[in-house]
């Protein structure tokens, strides 16, 4: 077993070797390096063929028409294009948008920008399981609502929204529905022939493809119109200009093709690993699972270890790569906005760690990580006066701390 161990697959995944090989064939002078927009010679034609093959592979994973796939630089751009594109195109119909408080920043910051432009945004608060219900959406739909934007799988806690039911609701009311599927593609089955979803964002690097490439599904029936946010040579039917990066697209296509073949078996393997890890740490006292216990992807396990600082635990796990629910790493001491929205208090939010498992995780790594977590939590609690007080039966929430 090699150290350090990577258990942060929700942040990014390594590129699958099969994907890297396909990408390498599109870079050098004796490879498929042409510009897909070059219409007058074989180098361009070959590149265009590779791009269209990648488009078909992405469409096949989600059961869409390849013509509904628009290439972007990643899920952040896809979210921006979907939300701003709809808002600007349909603003004469209304200026009200619905989203939730636990979306990715790519959605939340885009919504904030639209608020500055005069749009009105309703931010729904999920239940403590991290799920937004169709009833919640229905309660805030208005005649001037033009878009609902909700994630499929939450990136911090792994809970799965019922996008099928929400889609039925939005379609019946004539409201467009955008879904951020960055964390669900390749993990949860997506069938866009059945789902009433108008726009869906995808990322390659969350599914063993390269960084810097993503896609936006834009429904043709019913047809969705977007106003472009990047202008130029009119690539991607004018929705997203810029020379297409053949090697990236080939990589994303291959990654999605592999996901389609291996998803069912891989999900079972990951669930076994996640259960194995949880079983070994579940003897720890004051351990809380964040997010839904049932509607969740097995790849993500977000745990709060009460009376332990998330940052201290991260530092103690020096040869295990995980991420903390509190964003101290990004120079702020604010606890995770997602966990706060789920109703977790600051202490539990600050003591959370996200473990995420993936294609190259082994049983040996999981066992090692679980052992190290138990050792670190017990050691840190031994040093904690709050833990001593809790063990002595003192209700810490009732203590009035003196200001200093």
UniProtKB/Swiss-Prot annotation:
Chief location category: cytoplasm
Pathway(s) of this molecule: Cofactor biosynthesis; iron-sulfur cluster biosynthesis
Membrane spanning stretches: none
Modified residues (N6-(pyridoxal phosphate)lysine): 206
EC class (word): transferase
Active-site residues (renumbered): 328
Pfam families: Aminotran_5
Places the protein is found: Cytoplasm
One Gene Ontology cellular component: L-cysteine desulfurase complex
Binding partners and assembly: Homodimer. Forms a heterotetramer with IscU, interacts with other sulfur acceptors.
Protein name, UniProt field: Cysteine desulfurase IscS
């Amino acid at each position: 077993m090699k150290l350090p161990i990577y258990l942060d697959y929700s942040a990014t995944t390594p590129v699958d070797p099969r994907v890297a090989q396909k990408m390498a064939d599109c870079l050098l002078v004796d490879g498929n390096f042409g510009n897909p927009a070059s219409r007058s010679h074989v180098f361009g034609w070959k590149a265009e063929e590779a791009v269209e093959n990648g488009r078909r592979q992405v469409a096949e994973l989600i059961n869409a028409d390849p013509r509904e796939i628009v290439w972007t630089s990643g899920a952040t751009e896809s979210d921006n294009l979907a939300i701003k594109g709809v808002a600007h195109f349909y603003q004469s119909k209304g200026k009200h948008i619905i989203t939730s408080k636990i979306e990715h920043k790519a959605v939340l910051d885009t919504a904030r920008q639209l608020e500055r432009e005069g749009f009105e945004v309703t931010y729904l608060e999920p239940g403590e399981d991290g799920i937004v219900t169709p009833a919640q959406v229905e309660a805030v739909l208005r005649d001037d609502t033009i878009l609902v934007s909700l994630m499929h799988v939450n990136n911090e806690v792994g809970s799965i929204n019922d996008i099928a039911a929400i889609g039925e609701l939005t379609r019946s009311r004539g409201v467009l529905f955008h879904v951020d599927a960055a964390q669900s593609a390749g993990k949860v089955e997506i069938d866009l022939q059945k789902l009433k979803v108008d726009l869906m964002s995808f990322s390659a690097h969350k599914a063993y493809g390269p960084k810097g490439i993503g896609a936006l599904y834009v429904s043709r029936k019913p047809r969705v119109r977007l106003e472009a946010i990047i202008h130029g040579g009119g690539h991607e039917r004018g929705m997203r200009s810029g020379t297409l990066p053949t090697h990236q697209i080939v990589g994303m296509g291959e990654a999605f093709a592999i996901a389609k073949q291996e998803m069912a078996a891989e999900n079972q393997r990951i669930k076994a690993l996640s259960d194995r890890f949880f079983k070994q740490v579940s003897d720890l006292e004051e351990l809380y699972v964040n997010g839904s216990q049932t509607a969740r992807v097995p790849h993500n396990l977000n745990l709060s270890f009460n009376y332990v600082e998330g940052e201290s635990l991260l530092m103690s796990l020096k040869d295990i790569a995980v991420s903390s629910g509190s964003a101290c790493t990004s120079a702020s001491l604010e606890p995770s906005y997602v966990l706060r929205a789920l109703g977790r208090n600051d202490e539990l939010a600050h003591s959370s760690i996200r473990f995420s498992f993936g294609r190259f995780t082994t049983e040996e790594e999981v066992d090692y990580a679980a052992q190290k977590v138990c050792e670190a939590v017990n050691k840190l609690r031994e040093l904690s006066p709050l833990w001593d007080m809790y063990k002595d039966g003192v209700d810490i929430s009732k203590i009035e701390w003196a200001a200093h």
